[in-house]
Amino acid sequence: MTVKTEAAKGTLTYSRMRGMVAILIAFMKQRRMGLNDFIQKIANNSYACKHPEVQSILKISQPQEPELMNANPSPPPSPSQQINLGPSSNPHAKPSDFHFLKVIGKGSFGKVLLARHKAEEVFYAVKVLQKKAILKKKEEKHIMSERNVLLKNVKHPFLVGLHFSFQTADKLYFVLDYINGGELFYHLQRERCFLEPRARFYAAEIASALGYLHSLNIVYRDLKPENILLDSQGHIVLTDFGLCKENIEHNSTTSTFCGTPEYLAPEVLHKQPYDRTVDWWCLGAVLYEMLYGLPPFYSRNTAEMYDNILNKPLQLKPNITNSARHLLEGLLQKDRMKRLGAKDDFMEIKSHVFFSLINWDDLINKKITPPFNPNVSGPNDLRHFDPEFTEEPVPNSIGKSPDSILVTASVKEAAETFLGFSYAPPTDSFL
């Protein structure tokens, strides 16, 4: 017996129909194991995927926008384009491995949650991002860049470490070091400004982290108090690498307009090519804020603030030392070619007289006692997180794979876009 269908759909024989029925019966038996595994089996059967009945049952549909419609059927997907809705090949990396306890941060594409690994009894900060939101804003390159940068940061004491990353059909998960001493921004808000020794200590650890990134040809581009955390002992931890630019060598430049308004360097505002020295401008802006309570050139009117950054001379009040004044003048030099760090990068910062009291070997080995201790009692101590976050309920969807998700064209696009996102550490690392 042969059933004739449209020519474009091919010929459906009795044996092939039996094969499809067997797949559907298997689906019913495996329902409790989750839809994702079944979908993966279907997706690997290119003939079954093209059949209209299978498409109808699984809701695998083409985009409905008129400009995307194509009368000709698409060719079978290549192996690299197959729908991959499994969370990860790493057995440690799936949502159900965690107890998600509290929301501790929010961003443009998702939330950061305090989570405890069920088997390891270890606390992590898990950054959960919505694929749909990332694709809508066309930020997928920045997300993958953030993952790549995180993989390189594992061994630096002042950069947040990535333990593993994985994905479900609709979400990306970064499993990161849990840092609960609070954002530098939070502490600045409470105390308004810091005494110079404390500001020096933080600036030195920040500079060390930036210098390490530069040694990897990475420009950070978004240094600000919100991205600087304190760990439980009071050391700096730099986080959020979404705006990092890779492959920027010493004499290389880039031109993407990005950053946070208060901390943008003049060359970025001018939309001119810029280099690593944008990070030293930002360090100057953060140091200024630590000493004075507001960023340099600040105005509530953004246009006026931009004009100040471009044209207004730097004004320094007399309540800082000459070495601090000299450092700020060097870092906040409007001409990037004359800026401190333009010639020898981190070595210029490191050798500045303002840091003469810093033993850099002791600093990198955390042998210098921080000037402030957050005094957290343990992982569950959330006193340094904004209650706006911690009082928000944890979404139920965070901790499980979405068994009932429909495999639409957008899900297919997301699966293809983020192929290779999942990461598991070597067996002798972390887990």
UniProtKB/Swiss-Prot annotation:
<feature type="modified residue" description="Phosphoserine; by MAPK7">
    <location>
        <position position="78"/>
    </location>
</feature>
<dbReference type="GO" id="GO:0005739">
    <property type="term" value="C:mitochondrion"/>
</dbReference>
<dbReference type="GO" id="GO:0106310">
    <property type="term" value="F:protein serine kinase activity"/>
</dbReference>
<keyword id="KW-0597">Phosphoprotein</keyword>
<dbReference type="InterPro" id="IPR008271">
    <property type="entry name" value="Ser/Thr_kinase_AS"/>
</dbReference>
<feature type="modified residue" description="Phosphothreonine; by PKA">
    <location>
        <position position="369"/>
    </location>
</feature>
<dbReference type="InterPro" id="IPR000961">
    <property type="entry name" value="AGC-kinase_C"/>
</dbReference>
<dbReference type="InterPro" id="IPR017441">
    <property type="entry name" value="Protein_kinase_ATP_BS"/>
</dbReference>
<feature type="compositionally biased region" description="Polar residues">
    <location>
        <begin position="81"/>
        <end position="91"/>
    </location>
</feature>
<dbReference type="GO" id="GO:0005524">
    <property type="term" value="F:ATP binding"/>
</dbReference>
<feature type="region of interest" description="Disordered">
    <location>
        <begin position="66"/>
        <end position="92"/>
    </location>
</feature>
<keyword id="KW-1003">Cell membrane</keyword>
<feature type="modified residue" description="Phosphothreonine; by PDPK1">
    <location>
        <position position="256"/>
    </location>
</feature>
<dbReference type="GO" id="GO:0006915">
    <property type="term" value="P:apoptotic process"/>
</dbReference>
<dbReference type="InterPro" id="IPR011009">
    <property type="entry name" value="Kinase-like_dom_sf"/>
</dbReference>
<feature type="modified residue" description="Phosphoserine">
    <location>
        <position position="74"/>
    </location>
</feature>
<keyword id="KW-1015">Disulfide bond</keyword>
<keyword id="KW-0723">Serine/threonine-protein kinase</keyword>
<dbReference type="InterPro" id="IPR000719">
    <property type="entry name" value="Prot_kinase_dom"/>
</dbReference>
<keyword id="KW-0053">Apoptosis</keyword>
<keyword id="KW-0346">Stress response</keyword>
<keyword id="KW-0832">Ubl conjugation</keyword>
<dbReference type="GO" id="GO:0004674">
    <property type="term" value="F:protein serine/threonine kinase activity"/>
</dbReference>
<feature type="region of interest" description="Necessary for localization to the mitochondria">
    <location>
        <begin position="1"/>
        <end position="60"/>
    </location>
</feature>
<dbReference type="Pfam" id="PF00069">
    <property type="entry name" value="Pkinase"/>
</dbReference>
<keyword id="KW-0808">Transferase</keyword>
<dbReference type="GO" id="GO:0005886">
    <property type="term" value="C:plasma membrane"/>
</dbReference>
<keyword id="KW-0472">Membrane</keyword>
<feature type="binding site">
    <location>
        <begin position="104"/>
        <end position="112"/>
    </location>
    <ligand>
        <name>ATP</name>
    </ligand>
</feature>
<keyword id="KW-0256">Endoplasmic reticulum</keyword>
<comment type="function">
    <text>Serine/threonine-protein kinase which is involved in the regulation of a wide variety of ion channels, membrane transporters, cellular enzymes, transcription factors, neuronal excitability, cell growth, proliferation, survival, migration and apoptosis. Plays an important role in cellular stress response.</text>
</comment>
<feature type="short sequence motif" description="Nuclear localization signal">
    <location>
        <begin position="131"/>
        <end position="141"/>
    </location>
</feature>
<keyword id="KW-0496">Mitochondrion</keyword>
<feature type="binding site">
    <location>
        <position position="127"/>
    </location>
    <ligand>
        <name>ATP</name>
    </ligand>
</feature>
<protein>
    <recommendedName>
        <fullName>Serine/threonine-protein kinase Sgk1</fullName>
        <ecNumber>2.7.11.1</ecNumber>
    </recommendedName>
</protein>
<feature type="domain" description="AGC-kinase C-terminal">
    <location>
        <begin position="356"/>
        <end position="431"/>
    </location>
</feature>
<dbReference type="GO" id="GO:0005634">
    <property type="term" value="C:nucleus"/>
</dbReference>
<dbReference type="GO" id="GO:0005789">
    <property type="term" value="C:endoplasmic reticulum membrane"/>
</dbReference>
<dbReference type="InterPro" id="IPR017892">
    <property type="entry name" value="Pkinase_C"/>
</dbReference>
<feature type="domain" description="Protein kinase">
    <location>
        <begin position="98"/>
        <end position="355"/>
    </location>
</feature>
<keyword id="KW-0539">Nucleus</keyword>
<comment type="subunit">
    <text>Homodimer; disulfide-linked. Forms a trimeric complex with FBXW7 and NOTCH1. Interacts with MAPK3/ERK1, MAPK1/ERK2, MAP2K1/MEK1, MAP2K2/MEK2, NEDD4, NEDD4L, MAPT/TAU, MAPK7, CREB1, SLC9A3R2/NHERF2 and KCNJ1/ROMK1. Associates with the mammalian target of rapamycin complex 2 (mTORC2) via an interaction with MAPKAP1/SIN1.</text>
</comment>
